[in-house]
UniProtKB/Swiss-Prot annotation:
GO terms for biological process: cytoplasmic microtubule organization; microtubule nucleation. Belongs to the tubulin family. InterPro entries: Gamma_tubulin, Tub_FtsZ_C, Tubulin, Tubulin/FtsZ-like_C, Tubulin/FtsZ_2-layer-sand-dom, Tubulin/FtsZ_GTPase_sf, Tubulin_C, Tubulin_CS. Tubulin is the major constituent of microtubules. The gamma chain is found at microtubule organizing centers (MTOC) such as the spindle poles or the centrosome, suggesting that it is involved in the minus-end nucleation of microtubule assembly. The gene is TUB4. It comes from Microbotryum violaceum (Anther smut fungus). This is Tubulin gamma chain. SUPFAM superfamilies: Tubulin C-terminal domain-like, Tubulin nucleotide-binding domain-like. GTP binds at A142, G143, G144, T145, G146, S147, G148. Keywords: Cytoplasm, Cytoskeleton, GTP-binding, Microtubule, Nucleotide-binding. PANTHER family: TUBULIN. Pfam families: Tubulin (PF00091), Tubulin_C (PF03953). Transmembrane segments: none annotated. It is found in: Cytoplasm, Cytoskeleton, Microtubule organizing center, Spindle pole body.
């Protein structure tokens, strides 16, 4: 029986990515823009039910709830080419309008206000599932709605469905050229929720997405449509084993269990190859796609959809790797490729766990024509992800020393009396950075047991001292 997944998209970026994702899933399953199965879609080995359900008239409808605080993006989806695909009851925007003004606190407060209506939609979809496995939250953490409202939803969904998995696709801001001046505040406050309430976070960032667009598409300035296409390609590939199941990794819990050995270190990076012209216009052609070639390319930093330093720290290493290889692949080729990669020490692993690349083989959609035989997605848990969090903390500290823009946050009830929430968020993220650094050492198994470990109430004081110091 398929384990269903409910997709919740929040804010402008989340809904634009979600819209692109659904158009891609329709193409891969032979579903028309109206939700009708095409006459030529005769392959019945796929599991459409994971992401779609059938209405009484047999139309396929996405298991999706779309939420925003202002109507512009949702209106464009409702009037776009896929307007008849979605359940019209599953669109929500705040009747007060106006959005969150790139303010996490405003988005969070709006979440409290609209909670009942939004949760009614989520509950209805969840109860309509036979065997709900979990949720996918799509959002950005730089602005106001995706970060603030997204954070509130994450907390509430975790409380309401404690036994269901929550995986997020979280777009992190470009640290060097962000257009939201308060993005370090918004990012840090969101990070606390992603650390404490999500089971798995797939980190994407605008800087890496733009760089891939420049490299593959020959465009100086990537449009949102182009970067969203990259993200939807990765989302489609990461859910391929759920929709075209094989012997392994055919549910979300199996994938997460293999990638996340410890609960807090659940931030994953992705790499994908090849981004070729059948997916995105103008993309560079990759002439040869053998299994070895694809698996080598996946380990190259330039194919990552997240910006980590190209020269990582000496001790940086992989905690785990799962390669999802799509296409007609001979398992013996996979075995040979893994041996070659191991011989060349292409990937450095943690000293306290298995040093192995896991591989899941899955077929490509028979309805989407590709120019390559093999494509691959790498989901990886790498200690160097902490460098992104360090950058966020450093930028936060610069603003917080001057209490810059703080009055905007103090207008909301959460920050009226004090700024403890900021201190707690900073301490949570600092703890996370330290845990990823501890993962690089052989004695990580004992981490958290020693006298130097700070937890609970001491976190807030620790965060405040770090900023003032």
């Amino acid at each position: 029986m398929p384990r269903e997944i409910l997709t919740v998209s929040a804010g402008q970026a989340g809904n634009q990515i979600g819209s692109e994702f659904w158009s891609q899933l329709c193409a891969e399953h032979g579903i028309s823009k109206e939700g009708v199965l095409e006459d030529w879609a005769t392959d019945m080995t796929d599991r459409k039910d994971v992401f779609f359900y059938q209405a009484d008239d047999e139309h396929y409808i996405p298991r999706a709830v779309m939420i925003d605080l202002e109507p512009r993006v949702l209106d464009s989806i409702k009037s776009g080419p896929y307007k008849n695909l979605y359940n019209p009851e599953n669109f929500f925007y705040d009747p007060q309008g106006g959005g969150a003004g790139n303010n996490w606190a405003k988005g969070y407060a709006a979440g409290e206000r609209v909670y009942e209506e939004v949760m009614e939609m989520i509950d209805r979809e969840a109860e309509g599932s036979d065997s709900l496995e979990g949720f996918m939250l799509l959002h950005s953490i730089a602005g106001g709605t995706g970060s603030g409202l997204g954070s509130y939803l994450l907390e509430r969904m975790n409380d309401r469905y404690p036994k269901k998995l929550i995986q997020t696709y979280s777009v992190f801001p470009d640290a060097d050229s962000g257009d939201v001046v308060v993005q370090p505040y918004n990012s840090l406050l969101s990070m606390k929720r992603l650390t404490n309430h999500a089971d798995s976070v797939i980190v994407l960032d605008n800087a890496a997405l733009s760089k891939i667009c420049q490299d593959r598409l020959h465009v100086q300035v990537a449009s949102f449509a182009q970067t969203n296409q990259l993200v939807s390609t990765v989302m489609s590939a990461s859910t391929q084993t759920l929709r075209y199941p094989g012997y392994m990794n055919n549910d979300l819990v199996g994938m997460i269990a293999s990638l996340i050995p410890t609960p807090r270190c659940h931030f994953l990076t992705t790499s994908y190859t090849p981004f070729t012209s059948d997916k995105i216009e103008q993309a560079k052609a990759v002439r040869k796609t053998t299994v070895l070639d694809v698996m080598r390319r996946l380990l190259q930093p330039k194919n990552r959809l997240v910006s980590m330093p190209t020269t990582p720290s000496r001790h940086a290493c992989y905690i785990s790797i799962l390669n999802i290889i799509q296409g007609e692949v001979d398992p013996t080729d996979v075995h040979k490729s893994l041996l070659r990669i191991r011989e060349r020490n292409s990937a450095t692993f943690i000293p306290w766990g298995p040093a192995s690349i896991q591989v899941a083989l899955t077929k490509q959609s028979p309805y989407v024509q590709t120019t390559h035989k093999v494509s691959g997605l790498m989901l990886a848990n790498h200690t160097n992800i902490a460098s992104i969090f360090k950058r966020t903390v450093a930028q936060y500290d610069q603003l917080r020393k001057r209490n810059a823009f703080m009055p905007q946050y103090q207008k909301e009830a959460m920050f009226e009396k004090n700024l403890d929430e900021f201190d707690e968020a900073r301490a949570t993220v600092q703890d996370l950075i330290e845990e990823y650094q501890a993962c690089e050492k052989a004695d990580y198994i004992d981490y958290g047991a020693g006298p130097g470990y700070v937890k609970g109430e001491d976190r807030r004081e620790k965060g405040r001292e770090a900023v003032e110091g």
